[in-house]
Structure formats: structure tokens, C-alpha cells
Amino acid sequence: MRLGVLGVGALAEALIRGVQQSDCPFEWCLSPRSAERVAQLQALPGISVAADNQAVADQCDMLLVGVRPQQLEQLAASVQLTPEHHLICLSAGVELQTLQQAFHPARVTRMTASIAVAYPGSSVFLYPADTELSAKFTAAGYGVQSFATELQFEASMLSVCVNAWWLEQVQALAETLVEQTGMRLPEAVALLARAQQESAVLLQQRPESTPTALAREIGTPGTFTARGLDHLKANQAERPWVEILNQLLTELKRS
């Protein structure tokens, strides 16, 4: 797949690097914006640089928009698009209808991801669903999830927030392992990362089971696991997580 990039921001750069590491790399045509990033990306195979935004659009029907929301109006004024163009927009918080009006008559798909997109095996989220786009990113080794409504898509961005929240907990747990066992911090982090990977495998391979059911299946009565689950539940360990998630979801609905 040949994909033009209008504005090589941090997330667009991460996506390009990740895809180019995969077994199914794309061909990319970059706008010259963000000269330092573009120069570094040119060292990768399959990367070319066009003279300007319009030159990118002239060469590619599929275009990745990687600029900040406040830069979209300026970008839209710099290119003439056709109904054959398909824009994939990474700009957060901008509704599909607004994007469609700004980039008419092109087709528009919203996309979000975390910085982990620099590595195949991470996920990208789409709205609305697009079969061709999903197939291309799946072939490149990414998990792809699409949503029925724009609110659900906006909420998917909070899963990226949860990643950061979890990483803070990993730090605290890893430091405890270091203090109590003499384990080196990288070893402790790797141990906890593998545990999280195993949890993800269980959730993916056994979708018929709830997370709580899986936890209790592992934590049979009398085990350390069960003691930990009971302690965390008694102290409502999930409460601050649920509170902030509810607060952010409420703000999303208002916006």
C-alpha cells in the first residue's frame, strides 16, 4: 500500500516506523513538514519525500493526516482533493463531520493509537470501519478495532490513557520486588510485563469468560492470588480507576 503523509507528527512517525518493521511494510510519501523527523525517516526503506502537501496528494490517493487539530484548517487550505482520496486522520478530538467538511470531497476515516504503535503487535482504532484499511494494518501485524459510534471511538482513546496509568502501577510493583528480593529493576519490569502479556492472552483467547471469572479461576481459594484479590477488593482498589474513567467519559460526552 502507498500512503501519503500530510504532517509528520510524533504519532505519524511512530506509525511509519512500526509498519516498516513489519512483514508487510508500506510505501510512504511524506510532506516536507517537520524536516528533522522527515530526514530521519528517509533512512528507512520505502520512504520518499514530496515537494509540498499538494505533491503528496497528487501522488497518493490514501493520505495520513498527522498534524495537530489547530493546524487542520491551514492544511485543508493547502491541498485540493478529489472523491478518490481517502484521508486517515490522527488529529484527536475533531469530529468526523468537521473533517468531512474541511477535506471535502475526500472520504475520511478517523484513527487513533498510542506511541506503542511504533512496534508491530500494538493496536490501531478506526471510525468508521473500513475493510481495506483494517486488512492492511492487520497484515502489518497490528490489532485493529473499529467502532459503531463516534462516542465509542472517542472512548477508545481512554484505553491509551489506561496504558499510562498501568505503567505507573508497574513501577511501584517493580520497585517493591527490587527492595524485597534484590532483583534488578529491568528484571522486575520484564517479569511484570510478561504477567500482563499473559493476562492479555487469556482475555483474547477466552472472550466468553469475563475478566473477573478468569481472575478467580487463577486465584483459587487459599492461594496467594486469592489473598491478593480479596485484599484489593476489600480496599476498593478499582475505585480511583473507575472514578477518573467516569469523569473523563462524562467530559467526552459534553464536548
Residue ranges and their predicted role:
Residues 32-37, 93-95, 129-132:
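Short, polar loop motifs at secondary-structure junctions
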Residues 48, 52-103:
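Rossmann-fold NAD(P) dinucleotide-binding segment
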Residues 1-51, 55-59, 178-181:
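NAD(P)+-binding Rossmann beta1-loop-alpha1 motif at the extreme N-terminus of oxidoreductases
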Residues 193, 197-255:
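NAD(P)-dependent Rossmann-like dehydrogenase/reductase catalytic/cofactor-binding core
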Residues 28, 38, 56, 72, ...:
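Small-residue helix-packing motif on alpha-helices
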Residues 98-107, 122-206, 247-255:
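Internal alpha-helical scaffold of NAD(P)-dependent oxidoreductase catalytic cores
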Residues 28-32, 65, 87-90, 124-128:
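Short, hydrophobic beta-strand segments that form beta-sheet elements in well-ordered domains
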